[in-house]
């Protein structure tokens, strides 16, 4: 018996050790207060400081794990290590950490560099950082002995017959489709520039991996062979397979820029960076000229509007200056005293202090987060990296992989007039989502976009579409921005105080009430996520199909009218409204423990009932928590889908419940009276009673005065007393 028990314990120990080893290999060494200082004192350490509850840390997590997994072969045998510090447990180690996530590079126990985390942080950028510090003595612009082409290599390249008739400067993987007959073998005769170490094993490179930019350019200059480069933004492990299986886009363009032009561009970029917040402080703006220059600067300014009479502004100043110091060389930071510069504060309707606004090229957005250093730095990092850029298919794939919510605007030459309106909305999305532009037919096919222009939002890989019924809707800035604000949350966000207004802004919200303390919480949450994703995907397909039918009908009417040359019919056909509206239903999950008191209004105790689903209409304060058969709504796809359809199409078929309030209001609402109507009726009745009371009092006073005399008091008027009063 003892031997069996001992054997079981040993097997469990081996399993735990194996799992720990795998986690260590993938995510890095977990460091504690006891061993952090001793470990980092030897060699080079790249360490992530994080909090499990931090949203930014959760976004960084997959990128960090994938980076460590891909870099472990490169760092094997070297003195380079990866580590992680959980700041919720290791308080001493995180005493000097002002914001999470923070990435530090240690060499022999000293911090030598910090990697800023922001919107531009990606798995590729982290890998590049690691590669740079693995080979600190290697200059990528200087070819090593192994990189220089030998005479034999030169003869081999010179003898190759060019497979393309035009000069080619970029080969973009997974971009616009080319004929599938163009396989990788057609490029086997091209010399490929060594744009990155990651591509040295790619089959697109038939010339030796020794070929560098300078040597290939030299060979190309003495022969008719066109120089071909390969985009470096390709996954190193899948590059070989992608070249054979992916579709290609060949873009004809001039050959490599001259060294002089490259040097000038580099100098301009470095000069621009030097001019951005060079001292790492907040600049005081007082003169109108300085203020106007800052507010219209293309580099962007993060500005605090305050008043010298504001007590709260003094409390914020420490965090503000600390943020400004961390934005050295990244983002311009300033402050404006509204007691002195009244014009600027009046121009931007500053109502309270302090107010934080980010300006870029005359557009601005208000920061509404907490005024502490960590939150200010997070927003400032995103503001520093803010841009609205053109994207291709690979960019959208990476954004989906990172779990980002992003808006995508499709346009062509005929719809370019709407671009300024769309660009104007971009800065309003700062801190919530990214805005991208594209003309790619491949991306349009992926997201089932059948006509341009079209604005969509992609959440967890699922596209939802801006409902533009007529061309004028694409010019309506407020309507577009309102739709964006209603859709910048993920498919299944967690209900929080900060986002509750956005979540309950729609007609109905499907709430998954979960208990994080249960063992199957993660599995249940994944099921809820899958249900929400599949519903929105199905709704997107239905909406696009109906939109296409309506559009075809409109085009048919226009063509018929033009054939008959009927001007009135042509005008009527062009004014034909394309009907169609996406489902307004939104999804969210609720922490039943945290929101226990609020859930009592629904007569729900999550600990007693377990996970369940309700459909809540916040505008009318009504909800559905049972099926037509009277059973609770379970977290199952068919059940949830049926309830949503019934609520949207025939809400009277299901018996709704009213949010629990005081007994009097609840009783009246049970007869179908709306709470707002009740308040209005109550107000009218109250005013009526007051008018009746004061009117009666006034009438009685006037009546008394009519029956009184100027000589006798009222009490003696009917006594019959007469006589002398002297």
Swiss-Prot record:
It comes from the Eukaryota. The modification Phosphoserine is found at residue 708. It is found in: Membrane. Keywords: Membrane, Phosphoprotein, Transmembrane, Transmembrane helix. Residues 10-135 form the Thioredoxin domain. Gene3D superfamilies: Glutaredoxin (3.40.30.10). It is a single-pass membrane protein. Pfam families: Thioredoxin (PF00085), Thioredoxin_6 (PF13848). The chain crosses the membrane at residues 675-695. Residues 138-153 have a biased composition (Acidic residues). One of its GO terms (cellular component) is membrane. PANTHER family: PROTEIN DISULFIDE-ISOMERASE TMX3 (PTHR46426:SF1). This is Uncharacterized protein C3D6.13c. It comes from Schizosaccharomyces pombe (strain 972 / ATCC 24843) (Fission yeast).
